[in-house]
C-alpha cells in the first residue's frame, strides 16, 4: 500500500524538490531581469532588500530576488581574477539549478546532501546573503582554518561585491581582531573557533569590552555530519593546569606494566601449547573425523577461546582463526560459555586469567587472581581495590564518646582525605590498565616530541592540544615513558551539540547525511534533502572482494595496485589507521612500487601529497585524512587512463566514512572507480558481524587467495555497520541527555555572569545578592530554631564573624516568619554595606576629584569581586558534576534510573552552587580592605584601577593604584 502511495504521490523528498523547483524558476526569472541593470544599480539592491526586510517583508518573500542578485553577480564576475591563498584564480562559477535548489533548502533549515564536486561552497553563498540582510550574525562553519580562509576569499568576493562585509576566524587571531571580525555581516570559521569564543565570552571575559561575539542567528555547517555526529562526543573545553599533581601514574606504571606482562606471557604459553595440537591441520581444508583427534582439537580451541578473553590480538589466535572450521569451533565455545546454564563454568574458566578483556565493549575486568598477583607478587596494596564505607566511618566517629566536637570534625576531615586519596589511586590504576590493554599506539595515538598526540578516529588527523580526559592521557604518557603532565582543570565546557542549539536557525551541507537522517531529525529537528547531481556520476563501484585472511587480502591489494599502476591510473589507497598505512607501505616498498604516504605522522605535507595524488601513475597510501574535504584534481593523462582508482583496505564502522572515501573519485563527470578489499579478520567483521557468518564461511570457503563476492556478504557488512551505528547513536543520545542537564545550568550561570558584566550600577546587583543571602540565612535560622538540637547561637556566631552585624534573638523569635526575618537580616546587611561603600566612594571622590570616575572605580571593584566568585565556584561545580556523572551509573545496580538520579542530584548541587556563590560574594564584599596609592606618572590619564583579588577565606588588603596627575601642594 505504501509503495503504491509513493508511486502515486511521490516520496517526501520528491515532493519537496518539486515545490522548491518553482522557486528556482522565479530565481532564474529575477536573474534575467537584473541582467539589464548596471553594476551600481545591482549593488543598490542590497540596501533596498535590507530596507524591505526592516519594513516587514519576510525573507521567504525576498528569496527569489536575493538569489537572483547573487546569480547575476556570479555571471558578471566571470573571468575576474580573485586572490585566494596568495594566488590569483579566475572566477568561473555561476550557480546551476541544482545548486539553487540546495540553497533554497538551506534557507529553509534543511541539511542538503550534495555529492562531491557539486559546488556546496557556492551554494552556501545564496542563503548567507539572504540571511545577512537581517543585520543579525550569520556564520559559515567549516572543518578547518584553511577552508574557512579559502571560502572567505573565494566565494566571499561575491558578498563583498554586493556591499556586505566578510571576516574569517582562524586560530591565533587576537581578541581585538576577533571583535572586529564578529561585526562583519558574514563570518567564516571552524566550529571550535566559534565555540571557544562563546566559552571565553561567558567564562573568561571580566569586562563587557572583552567579549567579542554578538549573538547566534543563522549558521550553515559544512560537513555537518562530521561536526554534529563524529565530533558530538568530544566537548570543547577551556582548561588550565590542575592545582594538584596526581603521582599515582608515576608510582604505579611499572607495576601495571608487570601485571600486563604476566597476562601476556600466560596467554602466549596457552596459545603455543594449543598450536602444537592444531599445527598439523592449519594447512588442510577439512578436519579429521577421528573422535580423539576431534576432542583434542576442540580442547585446543577451548584454550584459544580463553586466550581471546585475555589477549584478543594474540598472533597464534589470529593465525588459527584463518581456518574456517577452527574459527567456527572457537566461536562455538564462545556461544557455549555465554549460555545462562554454563555461567558458572565460564566464570571458573575466566578466573584463571589475571585480567578479562572485553574487546567488543572496549572494557576489562581484573579477576581475583589478578588482584592477588597485584598484592602478593607485584607489591600493590589490598586497599587499591576496596573503597571506604564513609557512612560507617562517620558513624564510628560519632559514637566515640571520648572525642570532642572539634576532634570529631578533624577525624571526619582526615577520613574524607583518606577516601579521596584511595579513590584517586584506584582510578589511576584502572586508567593505567586501560592504557595498556585497550589503547593502541599508531591507532588511537602517536608519540611525537615527547608528547602523546591523539588521532581522530574519523578523520585520521592528529589532534594536537587535545587530551584524553579523566587521567587516561597521563596513563598513556606513563605507558609510553614520556613526560607525565599535570591533569588539567576544566574552567568551561560545552558540547558541539548544545553549542549549535544556540542558533535561531541552523542548516548544513555534506555529501553523506542520509544514513544519519534519523539522528538529525530526533536530536536537532533537521531534515535531510538529497539534491540531484548536475552531471551523472561516472564512478564504477566494484563489488567488495572478501578474503578469508588478512594475509590473502593484502596479497590481493598489492596485485590490484600493480595491475592498475601499469595502466597509468592514479591510485588512492584508504587505510583505517597509521599502523595499517605503514604496514601497506612496507609491502609496496618490497614490491618496488613508488608511492607516498599520508597519515597523522606526516600531515604537514598533506597539501603537497594531495596535489600530486591525481597525476598519472601516482600511488598514495592514506588514512581517513584523505576522505573528507579533500579535492584530488586529475591531470589530462590521468583522465585518459580512466581516472582515480580508490582502493579501500577495509570497511569503516560508519557507512558515511566509506562513502566519503568513494567520493574522492569521479567528481563532476570525471571517470573513476572504487573497490573495497575485506577479510573476515577485519575488526568490523570480527566484532560486529552476524553469527551466520561462520556458517557461510564454512560453506563458501574458496581456494587460497581467491576472493568471494556475493550480495549476501554485502548485506552482512551493511548489517554490521548498522549495528555499530545504532550503538554509537545510543551512546551519543545518552551523552546528550546528561549534557542537557549541564546545559541548563550553564545557561543560567552564563546569563547571571552576563547580567553582571553589562550592569550599569553594580551596587544594585550587590544588594540583590545580599537579599538572597538574607533569605537563605532566615531559612537556616528558623529551621534550627524549631529543631530539638537548636544551634541558633552557633549560626549567630558565624554570622557575626562573617558579616559586621549582630542579630537580636528576641526580634527573630518575635518575627517568626521567614520573609519577615529575611527582611530584618537584609536591612541590617544592606545598611552595613551602604556605610562601608559610601565611605569608600567618598574617599575615592576626594582623591580623584571626580564623583563619576569614583563611581566607575567602585563599580569595577564590585564587578570583579562578583565575577571572580562566579568563576571560582563554577570551576568547583564542574568537578563535582564530573564526579557525579562517573559515579551515578552504579545506581542501576540498585534498580534506579541513573539519568533520573543524575538530574535529581545535579539539581541539589546546582542549588548549593548558587547559594555558595552568593555567600562568597557577600562575605568578600564585607571583608574587602583597600589602601590607596597614587602613581608618579606625569601623564593625565583617565583614572583606572589595578586590583588583585584573593580567596575570600584568606583575603589580604587590595592595593588600588590611581593613575592621574599629581596634585600640587
Curated annotation (Swiss-Prot):
Gene3D superfamilies in alphabetical order: Helical scaffold and wing domains of SecA (1.10.3060.10), P-loop containing nucleotide triphosphate hydrolases (3.40.50.300), SecA, preprotein cross-linking domain (3.90.1440.10)
A GO term for molecular function: protein-exporting ATPase activity
InterPro entries: Helicase_ATP-bd, Helicase_C-like, P-loop_NTPase, SecA, SecA_CS, SecA_DEAD, SecA_motor_DEAD, SecA_preprotein_X-link_dom
GO cellular component entries: cell envelope Sec protein transport complex; cytoplasm; plasma membrane
Sites where the protein binds ATP: 99, 117-121, 631
Keywords: ATP-binding, Cell inner membrane, Cell membrane, Cytoplasm, Membrane, Nucleotide-binding, Protein transport, Translocase, Translocation, Transport
EC number in record: 7.4.2.8
Compartments where found: Cell inner membrane; Cytoplasm
Membrane topology classification: Peripheral membrane protein
Lineage: superkingdom: Bacteria
Gene Ontology biological-process annotations: intracellular protein transmembrane transport; protein import; protein targeting; protein transport by the Sec complex
Catalytic class of the enzyme: translocase
SUPFAM superfamilies reported for this sequence: Helical scaffold and wing domains of SecA, P-loop containing nucleoside triphosphate hydrolases, Pre-protein crosslinking domain of SecA
Family label: Belongs to the SecA family.
NCBIfam families: secA
Function: Part of the Sec protein translocase complex. Interacts with the SecYEG preprotein conducting channel. Has a central role in coupling the hydrolysis of ATP to the transfer of proteins into and across the cell membrane, serving as an ATP-driven molecular motor driving the stepwise translocation of polypeptide chains across the membrane.
Subunit structure: Monomer and homodimer. Part of the essential Sec protein translocation apparatus which comprises SecA, SecYEG and auxiliary proteins SecDF. Other proteins may also be involved.
HAMAP family linked: SecA
Protein name: Protein translocase subunit SecA
Biological source species: Chlamydia trachomatis serovar D (strain ATCC VR-885 / DSM 19411 / UW-3/Cx)
Gene: secA
Amino acid at each position: 500500500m505504501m509503495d503504491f502511495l509513493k508511486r502515486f504521490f511521490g516520496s517526501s523528498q520528491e515532493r519537496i524538490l518539486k515545490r522548491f523547483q518553482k522557486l528556482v524558476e522565479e530565481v532564474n526569472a529575477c536573474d534575467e531581469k537584473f541582467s539589464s541593470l548596471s553594476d551600481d544599480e545591482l549593488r543598490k539592491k542590497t540596501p533596498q532588500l535590507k530596507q524591505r526586510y526592516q519594513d516587514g517583508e519576510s525573507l521567504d518573500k525576498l528569496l527569489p530576488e536575493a538569489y537572483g542578485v547573487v546569480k547575476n553577480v556570479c555571471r558578471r564576475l566571470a573571468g575576474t581574477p580573485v586572490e585566494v591563498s596568495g594566488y590569483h584564480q579566475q572566477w568561473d562559477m555561476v550557480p546551476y539549478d541544482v545548486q539553487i535548489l540546495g540553497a533554497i533548502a538551506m534557507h529553509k533549515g534543511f541539511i542538503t546532501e550534495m555529492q562531491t564536486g557539486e559546488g556546496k561552497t557556492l551554494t552556501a553563498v545564496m542563503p548567507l546573503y539572504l540571511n545577512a540582510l537581517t543585520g543579525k550574525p550569520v556564520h559559515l562553519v567549516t572543518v578547518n582554518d584553511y577552508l574557512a580562509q579559502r571560502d572567505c576569499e573565494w566565494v566571499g568576493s561575491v558578498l563583498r561585491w554586493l556591499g556586505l562585509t566578510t571576516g574569517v576566524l582562524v586560530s591565533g587571531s587576537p581578541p581585538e581582531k576577533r571583535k572586529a571580525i564578529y561585526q562583519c555581516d558574514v563570518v567564516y570559521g571552524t566550529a571550535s573557533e566559534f565555540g571557544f569564543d562563546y566559552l571565553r565570552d561567558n567564562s573568561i571575559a571580566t569586562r563587557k569590552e572583552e567579549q567579542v561575539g554578538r549573538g547566534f542567528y543563522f549558521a550553515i555547517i559544512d560537513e555537518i555530519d562530521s561536526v554534529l555526529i563524529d565530533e558530538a562526543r568530544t566537548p570543547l573545553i577551556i582548561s588550565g593546569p590542575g592545582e594538584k599533581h596526581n603521582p599515582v601514574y608515576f608510582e604505579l606504571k611499572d607495576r601495571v606494566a608487570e601485571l600486563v606482562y604476566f597476562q601476556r606471557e600466560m596467554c602466549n604459553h596457552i596459545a603455543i601449547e594449543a598450536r602444537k595440537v592444531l599445527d598439523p591441520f592449519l594447512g588442510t581444508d577439512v578436519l579429521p573425523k577421528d573422535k580423539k583427534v576431534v576432542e583434542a582439537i576442540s580442547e585446543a580451541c577451548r584454550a584459544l577461546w580463553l586466550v581471546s578473553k585475555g589477549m584478543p590480538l594474540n598472533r597464534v589466535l589470529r593465525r588459527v582463526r584463518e581456518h574456517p572450521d577452527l574459527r567456527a569451533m572457537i566461536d562455538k565455545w564462545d556461544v557455549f560459555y555465554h549460555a545462562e546454564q554454563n555461567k558458572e563454568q565460564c566464570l571458573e574458566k575466566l578466573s584463571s586469567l589475571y585480567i578479562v578483556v572485553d574487546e567488543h565493549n572496549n572494557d576489562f575486568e581484573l579477576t581475583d587472581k589478578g588482584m592477588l598477583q597485584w598484592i602478593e607478587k607485584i607489591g600493590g596494596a589490598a586497599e587499591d581495590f576496596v573503597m571506604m564505607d564513609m557512612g560507617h566511618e562517620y558513624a564510628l566517629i560519632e559514637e566515640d564518646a571520648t572525642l570532642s566536637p572539634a576532634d570529631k570534625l578533624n577525624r571526619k576531615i582526615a577520613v574524607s582525605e583518606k577516601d579521596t586519596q584511595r579513590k584517586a589511586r584506584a582510578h589511576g590504576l584502572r586508567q593505567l590498565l586501560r592504557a595498556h590493554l585497550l589503547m593502541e599506539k599508531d591507532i588511537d595515538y602517536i608519540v611525537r616530541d615527547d608528547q602523546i598526540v591523539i588521532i581522530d578516529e574519523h578523520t585520521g588527523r592528529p589532534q594536537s592540544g587535545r587530551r584524553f580526559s579523566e587521567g587516561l592521557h597521563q596513563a598513556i604518557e606513563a605507558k609510553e615513558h614520556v613526560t607525565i603532565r599535570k591533569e588539567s582543570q576544566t574552567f568551561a565546557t560545552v558540547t558541539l551539540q548544545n553549542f549549535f542549539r544556540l542558533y535561531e536557525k541552523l542548516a548544513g551541507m555534506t555529501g553523506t547525511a542520509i544514513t544519519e537522517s534519523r539522528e538529525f531529525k530526533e536530536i536537532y529537528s533537521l531534515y535531510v534533502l538529497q539534491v540531484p547531481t548536475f552531471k551523472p556520476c561516472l564512478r564504477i563501484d566494484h563489488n567488495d572482494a572478501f578474503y578469508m585472511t588478512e594475509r590473502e587480502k593484502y596479497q590481493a591489494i598489492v596485485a590490484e595496485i600493480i595491475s592498475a599502476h601499469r595502466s597509468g591510473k592514479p591510485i588512492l589507497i584508504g587505510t583505517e589507521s597509521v599502523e595499517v598505512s605503514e604496514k601497506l607501505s612496507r609491502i609496496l616498498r618490497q614490491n618496488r612500487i613508488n608511492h607516498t604516504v599520508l597519515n597523522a605522522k606526516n600531515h604537514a605535507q598533506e597539501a603537497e601529497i594531495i596535489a600530486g595524488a591525481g597525476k598519472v601513475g601516482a600511488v598514495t597510501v592514506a588514512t581517513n585524512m584523505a576522505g573528507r574535504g579533500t579535492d584530488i584534481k586529475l591531470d589530462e593523462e590521468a583522465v585518459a587512463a580512466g581516472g582515480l582508482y580508490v582502493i579501500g583496505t577495509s570497511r569503516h564502522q560508519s557507512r558515511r566514512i566509506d562513502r566519503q572515501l568513494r567520493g574522492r573519485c569521479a567528481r563532476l563527470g570525471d571517470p573513476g572507480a572504487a573497490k573495497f578489499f575485506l577479510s573476515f579478520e577485519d575488526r568490523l567483521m570480527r566484532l560486529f558481524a552476524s553469527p551466520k557468518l561462520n556458517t557461510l564461511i564454512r560453506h563458501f570457503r574458496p581456494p587460497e587467495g581467491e576472493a568471494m563476492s556475493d550480495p549476501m556478504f554485502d548485506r552482512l557488512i551493511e548489517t554490521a555497520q548498522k549495528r555499530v551505528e545504532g550503538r554509537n547513536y545510543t551512546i551519543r543520545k545518552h551523552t546528550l541527555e546528561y549534557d542537557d542537564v549541564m546545559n541548563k545550568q550553564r545557561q543560567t550561570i552564563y546569563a547571571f555572569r552576563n547580567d553582571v558584566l553589562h550592569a550599569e550600577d553594580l551596587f544594585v546587583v550587590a544588594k540583590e545578592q545580599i537579599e538572597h543571602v538574607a533569605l537563605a540565612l532566615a531559612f537556616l535560622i528558623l529551621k534550627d530554631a524549631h529543631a530539638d538540637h537548636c544551634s541558633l547561637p552557633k549560626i549567630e556566631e558565624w554570622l557575626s564573624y562573617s558579616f559586621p552585624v549582630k542579630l537580636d534573638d528576641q526580634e527573630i523569635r518575635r518575627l517568626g516568619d521567614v520573609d519577615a526575618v529575611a527582611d530584618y537580616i537584609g536591612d541590617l546587611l544592606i545598611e552595613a554595606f551602604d556605610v562601608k561603600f559610601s565611605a569608600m566612594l567618598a574617599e575615592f571622590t576626594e582623591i580623584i576629584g571626580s564623583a563619576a570616575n569614583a563611581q566607575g572605580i567602585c563599580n569595577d571593584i564590585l564587578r570583579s569581586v562578583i565575577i571572580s566568585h562566579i568563576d571560582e565556584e563554577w570551576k568547583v561545580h564542574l568537578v563535582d558534576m564530573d564526579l557525579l556523572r562517573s559515579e551515578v551509573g552504579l545506581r542501576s545496580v540498585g534498580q534506579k534510573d541513573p539519568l533520573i538520579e543524575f538530574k535529581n542530584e545535579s539539581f541539589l548541587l546546582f542549588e548549593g552552587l548558587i547559594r555558595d556563590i552568593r555567600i562568597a560574594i557577600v562575605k568578600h564584599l564585607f571583608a574587602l580592605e583597600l589602601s590607596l596609592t597614587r602613581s608618579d606618572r606625569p601623564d593625565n590619564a583617565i583614572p583606572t584601577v589595578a586590583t588583585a583579588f584573593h580567596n575570600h577565606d584568606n583575603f589580604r588588603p587590595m592595593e588600588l593604584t590611581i593613575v592621574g596627575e599629581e596634585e600640587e601642594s
